[in-house]
Swiss-Prot record:
Induction: By stress conditions e.g. heat shock. Belongs to the heat shock protein 70 family. The gene is dnaK. Residues 601-624 are annotated as: Disordered. InterPro entries: ATPase_NBD, Chaperone_DnaK, Heat_shock_70_CS, HSP70_C_sf, HSP70_peptide-bd_sf, Hsp_70_fam. It comes from Xylella fastidiosa (strain 9a5c). Keywords: ATP-binding, Chaperone, Nucleotide-binding, Phosphoprotein, Stress response. One of its GO terms (molecular function) is ATP binding. PANTHER family: HEAT SHOCK PROTEIN 70KDA. The modification Phosphothreonine is found at T200. Acts as a chaperone. The keyword DNA repair does not apply. HAMAP family: DnaK (MF_00332). This is Chaperone protein DnaK. Pfam families: HSP70.
């Protein structure tokens, strides 16, 4: 069995880890960095850039550079959270045929968020393969604990498009707890994992216990907000800068994608700087121009001002902590340790808010950028048998049930139920003689079905006609270890049954996924061919240069016929290098090598002939030389 790699697929950055010698290890990417920006860009010449390369060119290519797409994955275009982002990103968010939120390039090519995420996963996969020296096909990928079924399915689809068999979807706070607690001694304890990342927020209350020599990680409760993270903090800074500039210059920079991208980079840098300093300056020369000439943005930002701008966002993260503790039946004093995960937790105000709520300082010995990937690798190690004596008991973050008469949401599996799990409930018909029922599967906490997330609808037909209330329809829910749901409905009298693995109305169809897998595979083949073409061109360029140097140096020593053949072959190769036909370039290179060989041989023969003549002359002179006799001279005596 090959390695099962662990991937933290983040909103802002992603991280890769493996198990080596029984311990987790973060793997550096090709740029030597331990995290990779979750950014994908499409260039004018059709090249796809991922990570740091995509981030570097974002300012000059804002409409084709996609970041923070994790906030769109598994979501509908009409969702309030998606609508909020429409005017705040320089790229276009569009509606797919099934109502999902997709993105579009400047030339109107529509892309699913899963496709963008798959590009990041492909880079992670390639990084692992380069490090391990073997093919990698299996992975454990993390998601926010509060991701619903659609978002989990979409993340698995992204893995599939990238050529990865996703062995397990694991919640980010749980992964961080695994990374933190695996080697810790000190008996049973309860910990809180506060995970404020680039685009999502989770909090999980987890009990770590020794049970029969096995370390058990049991999630007691989880809560969160899948649209709260560092991106929202950045946006507050961007809004402030835009408003200040508008007051000063009367120009709204929100309408300029290029300016918006520069502002995003500057806002992120300023926010990071203010975690370690009290004041910073945002200086963006030539941010825009009007009839009077170019305009420059220069605004001072203090830590106090930043904290005022994001105060409500920080407070918004505390309420889920209160709910999670309540769901776990615990008080803050019952929590022994608080772990901070996610880059946004480096902000002093966030750390202070967490310390104030839990009544204790959060631990600083956990790397907030790497803990989640390390935990995913540990889970991969457990599945592969490389890590022993670890049991992970996770929970479903939201209640699951069906719509019943009157639009009521009837829960079958309550939130924070340990998974995997199964539950059944018996229902009946609402009308006399009813021969079929529609099962509408939902996820959420509202009493009214219409306010919860619709996951699927399916029909159970062939029910024997009977007065209302008599037929016995057993609806069973089965959640696997990935938190993905399977539902069945069975008529207990006729034993007719309908089963479905819940595939939300949102999400990609199998044919769409297969097409994207094929596209990704074709792109990998395309990249390989591109590399081969570049190598052929580089070899040809070197050959052209060395041949021209040989003509210049030795051309006079060989016949004009040889030079003519070489020049003709050179011209053919130079023409081939301008094209994209690798085989043509290689063939013309081979021809030039063969033709130029006579030039090199003639030049070598000329050299040897010259050195032979020089040797004979030297030898004659040597014979005339008389060896001198030397006497040692001591002092003045000669």
């Amino acid at each position: 069995m090959g390695k099962i790699i662990g991937i933290d697929l983040g909103t802002t950055n992603s991280c890769l880890a493996i198990i080596e010698g029984g311990k987790g290890r973060v793997i550096e990417n090709s740029e030597g960095d331990r995290t990779t920006p979750s950014i994908v860009a499409y260039t004018k010449d059709g090249e796809v850039l991922v990570g740091a390369a995509a981030k570097r060119q974002a300012v000059t290519n804002p409409k084709n550079t996609f970041y923070a797409v994790k906030r769109l994955i598994g979501r509908k275009f009409g969702d309030a959270e998606v609508q909020k982002d429409l005017d705040l990103v320089p790229y276009k968010i569009t509606q797919h045929d099934n109502g999902d939120a997709w993105v579009a390039t400047a030339d109107a090519k529509k892309l699913a968020p899963q496709e963008i995420s798959a590009k990041v996963l492909e880079k992670m996969k390639k990084t692992a393969e380069d490090f391990l020296g073997e093919k990698v096909t299996e992975a454990v990928i993390t998601v926010p604990a509060y991701f619903n079924d659609s978002q989990r399915q979409a993340t698995k689809d992204a893995g599939r498009i990238a050529g990865l068999d996703v062995k397990r979807i694991i919640n980010e706070p749980t992964a961080a707890a695994l990374a933190y607690g695996l080697d810790k001694k000190g008996g049973d304890r309860k910990i809180a994992v506060y995970d404020l990342g680039g685009g999502t927020f989770d909090v999980s209350i987890i009990e770590i216990a020794e049970v029969d020599g096995e370390k058990q990680f049991e999630v007691l409760a989880t809560n969160g907000d899948t649209f709260l993270g560092g991106e929202d903090f950045d946006k507050r800074v961007i809004d402030y800068l835009v408003d200040e500039f508008n007051k000063d210059q009367g120009i709204d920079l929100r309408k300029d994608p290029l300016a918006l991208q520069r502002l995003k980079d500057a806002a992120e840098r300023a926010k990071i700087e203010l975690s370690s300093s009290q004041q910073t300056e945002v200086n963006l020369p030539y941010i825009t121009a009007d009839a009077s000439g170019p305009k420059h943005l220069n605004i001072k930002l203090t830590r106090a001002k930043l904290e005022a701008l994001v105060d409500d966002l920080v407070r918004k993260s505390i309420e889920p902590c209160r709910i999670a503790l309540n769901d776990a039946g615990l008080r803050t004093s019952d929590v022994q340790e608080v772990i901070l995960v996610g880059g946004q937790t480096r902000m002093p105000k966030v750390q202070q808010a967490v310390a104030d709520f839990f009544g204790k300082e959060p631990r600083k010995d956990v790397n907030p950028d790497e803990a989640v990937a390390l935990g995913a690798a540990i889970q991969g190690g457990v599945l592969a048998g490389d890590v022993k004596d670890v049991l992970l008991l996770d929970v479903t973050p939201l209640s699951l049930g069906i719509e019943t008469m009157g639009g009521v949401f009837t829960k079958i599996i309550e939130k924070n139920t340990t998974i995997p799990t199964k539950a059944s409930q018996v229902f009946s018909t609402a009308e006399d003689g009813q021969s079929a029922v529609t099962v509408h599967v939902l996820q959420g906490e509202r009493e009214q079905a219409r306010f919860n997330k619709s996951l699927a609808k399916f029909d159970l037909a062939g029910i024997e006609p009977a007065p209302r209330g008599q037929p016995q329809i057993e609806v069973s829910f089965d959640i696997d270890a990935n938190g993905i749901l399977h539902v069945s409905a069975k008529d207990k009298k006729t034993n007719k049954e309908q089963k479905v693995e819940v595939k939300a109305g949102s999400g990609l169809s199998d044919s769409e996924i297969q097409q994207m897998v094929a596209d990704a595979e074709a792109h990998r083949e395309e990249d390989k061919k591109f590399q081969e073409l570049v190598q052929a061109r580089n070899h040809a360029d070197g050959l052209i240069h060395s041949t021209r140097s040989a003509i210049k140096e030795h051309g006079s020593k060989v016949g004009g016929e040889v030079i003519g053949r070489v020049e003709a072959s050179l011209a053919e190769l130079e023409a081939a290098v301008k094209g994209d036909d690798k085989n043509q370039i290689e063939a013309k290179s081979k021809t030039l090598e063969e033709v130029a060989q006579s030039l090199h041989m003639a030049a070598t023969a000329e050299q040897q002939s010259g050195s032979t003549g020089a040797g004979a002359g030297s030898s004659a002179k040597v014979d005339d030389v008389v060896d001198a006799e030397f006497t040692e001279v001591k002092g003045d005596k000669k």
